[in-house]
């Protein structure tokens, strides 16, 4: 098997090697019983993870392609006119042939040449099509065309480019395009706000909204959905309330997606009373409304309320639960330790024609593990119809630490490291587990691997809202200039919890 693994390494690289060797390990695991076999398996796992390099991100800076183009001037155009119904149906293996049809090297730039032409509206349509097809490289090529043709000042084309870079995860580059736009419309403003909302940068979102209100563009319902998303992600209740007031002022109370966003925001920020008030008052609830409220109860450990709402869902509204609904109710059972109910809802999915997905299995594994049913959790993982991910193994590892099952914990840590070889926390946990059973050599090997890879555990961050501003801080970190206020608010919260 080692020869076969080495062959895969040479011929195809790391991923196939891991897949081939992992299948061999899984077959051998079933027959492991003796101390010698356990130690041998540990050595094999360490051999695998030590040979793995960290995964290199495939994320590209597509805007860099445009910056390179700005420094050179060697593009020309040919091809059929780009029209409003343009699409990327002619793509091959994810690399578009469109640019090859539209651009050649070393010739003069002309927006109309030999009977072929394009305009800003056509380019805008082409950029949108690139975004829909996730072909961001080609989209940046059309950005170059816009620069070459002098169309970059067009508001519709600029908005399409902002959306393109936002969807590619390059929010800062989207903002560069946005800043260069001489004119902006509601699409460009909303796209920029939603981009920063995805990163939970609520302060920037609100500043952009303030600038938008001073411009000629009026916000629409999607603008407020983006703002509420930012408040939801960062837990900014005060700012979320301000956005809520703005939606009422703008007459958007009856919009379903606004109501759903408000329910999610209030639930995430801990104000379940206001969340349920909006939920209860809205007559045209959809499955998202029910899911948001059930998930809110689950998040705050109110399992019985979540289950009661779930059981009312179909009789009261006729709304059929979906996979996300079951994820919410299973999560509520997990937090409350309701093993019997968790098994029931997991099996109930089949009655609604739903197949459990990875997240559902993860919830049930965590529920069983928290209750100390570690062998049942392990059997569930081994019998899953899909390959377990690192989250599931991490959940089992945590439960093993709590309940003192060292050997199952070692198995979970080893499996997780094979999936995430650069996870510093798992390295530390595995080293500690090896040490607890006297595997000193293996523990030293794991710590050496950490040192060689330069892995360090990252401290967790916390957020707190003071006077409508959200501040981030870390344990034993006094660098925040508002630390005294943060500590004061924390002490007030602790006193309040002790009083309850």
Swiss-Prot record:
- Recorded protein name is Pentatricopeptide repeat-containing protein At2g37320
NCBIfam families per the record? Answer: PPR (TIGR00756)
Q: Which gene encodes it?
A: PCMP-E50
Keywords annotated in UniProt: Repeat
What residue spans carry the region label Type E(+) motif? 468-498
Annotated organism of origin: Arabidopsis thaliana (Mouse-ear cress)
Q: Where are the PPR repeats?
A: 119-153, 154-184, 185-219, 220-254, 255-285, 286-321, 322-356, 357-387
- Gene Ontology molecular function: RNA binding
| Type E motif as annotated region, ranges | 392-467
Report if keyword Repeat is assigned.
Answer: yes
The UniProt record lists the keyword Repeat: yes
Query: What processes does the entry annotate via GO biological process terms?
Result: RNA modification
Similarity comment: family membership = Belongs to the PPR family. PCMP-E subfamily.
């Amino acid at each position: 098997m080692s020869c076969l693994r080495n062959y895969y390494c040479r011929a195809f690289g790391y991923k196939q090697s891991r897949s081939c060797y992992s299948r061999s390990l899984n077959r051998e695991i079933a027959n492991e019983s003796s101390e010698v076999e356990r130690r041998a398996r540990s050595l094999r796992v360490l051999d695998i993870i030590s040979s793995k390099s960290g995964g290199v991100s495939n994320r590209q800076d597509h805007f860099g392609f445009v910056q390179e183009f700005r420094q050179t001037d060697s593009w020309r155009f040919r091809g059929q006119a780009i029209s409003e119904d343009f699409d990327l149906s002619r793509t091959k293996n994810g690399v578009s042939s469109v640019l090859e049809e539209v651009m050649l090297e070393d010739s003069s730039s002309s927006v109309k040449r030999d009977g072929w032409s394009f305009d800003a509206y056509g380019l805008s349509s082409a950029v949108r099509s690139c975004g829909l097809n996730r072909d961001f490289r080609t989209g940046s090529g059309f950005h170059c065309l816009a620069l070459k043709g002098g169309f970059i000042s067009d508001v519709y084309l600029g908005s399409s480019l902002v959306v393109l870079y936002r969807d590619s995860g390059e929010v800062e580059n989207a903002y560069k395009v946005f800043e260069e736009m001489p004119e902006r419309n509601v699409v460009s403003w909303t796209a920029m706000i939603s981009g920063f909302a995805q990163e939970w940068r609520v302060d920037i979102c609100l500043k952009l909204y303030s600038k938008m209100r001073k411009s000629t563009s009026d916000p629409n319902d999607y603008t407020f959905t983006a703002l509420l998303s930012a408040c939801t992600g960062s837990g900014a209740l005060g700012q979320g309330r301000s956005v809520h007031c703005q939606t009422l002022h703008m007459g958007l109370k009856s919009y379903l997606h606004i109501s759903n966003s408000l329910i999610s925001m209030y639930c995430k920020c801990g104000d379940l009373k206001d969340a349920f008030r909006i939920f209860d008052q809205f007559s045209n609830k959809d499955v998202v409304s029910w899911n948001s409220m059930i998930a809110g109860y689950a998040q705050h450990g109110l399992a019985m309320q979540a289950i009661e709402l779930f059981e009312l869902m179909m009789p009261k509204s006729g709304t059929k639960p979906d996979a996300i609904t079951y994820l919410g109710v299973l999560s509520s059972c997990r937090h409350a330790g309701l093993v019997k109910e968790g098994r029931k809802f997991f099996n109930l999915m089949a009655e609604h024609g739903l197949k459990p997905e990875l997240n559902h299995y993860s919830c049930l594994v965590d529920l069983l593990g928290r209750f100390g049913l570690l062998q049942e959790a392990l059997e569930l993982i081994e019998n899953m119809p899909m390959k377990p991910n690192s989250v599931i193994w991490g959940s089992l590892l945590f439960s093993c630490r709590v309940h003192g099952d060292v050997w199952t914990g070692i198995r979970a840590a080893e499996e997780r490291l094979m999936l995430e070889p650069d996870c510093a926390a798992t390295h530390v946990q595995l080293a500690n587990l090896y040490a607890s059973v006297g595997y000193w050599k293996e523990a030293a090997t794991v710590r050496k691997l950490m040192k060689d890879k330069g892995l360090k555990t990252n401290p967790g961050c916390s957020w707190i809202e003071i006077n409508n501003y959200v501040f981030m801080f870390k344990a034993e970190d006094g660098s925040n200039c508002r630390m005294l206020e943060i500590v004061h608010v924390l002490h007030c919260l602790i006193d309040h919890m002790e009083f309850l």
